[in-house]
Amino acid sequence: MYKTILVTLDGTPTDRAIIEHIKQLAKLTQGRVVLLHVADGWAARTFGPDAVSPEITEDTAYLHKVRAEFQSEGIPAEAELAYGDPPKEIVKWVEQKGCDLVAMSTHGHRFLADIFLGTTSRHVRHSVRVPVLLLRAK
């Protein structure tokens, strides 16, 4: 079933819900996990992989910590840091890694921002050809 699961992380407490859910799912399917965070600050959007900032350092450390958490439970996991527009980068990584499931936490609606800008999850689910698991954080 799901052999390669892309888990998008934003570095906030809402990540915990999807992390715990995917640990269980990956164990059931004996799948591997690709953890992805898209740095989208000014430095990341301007300089891409050459960006240097405290945020990039924190993002990298966070990804490595979460990867170690999966690996300590026997789940093959890799951590990837992308740069730029989150929806576009997520879609690109789904295709590059051959993922057969995308897993995302959602923050819930923020009304006006969602109406005018849309949400990352909406853009992703309308752009990929694989299932998208959306889990609302508590």
Predicted region positions:
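Short, hinge-like loop/turn segments at secondary-structure boundaries
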Residues: 51-54, 96-98, 120-122
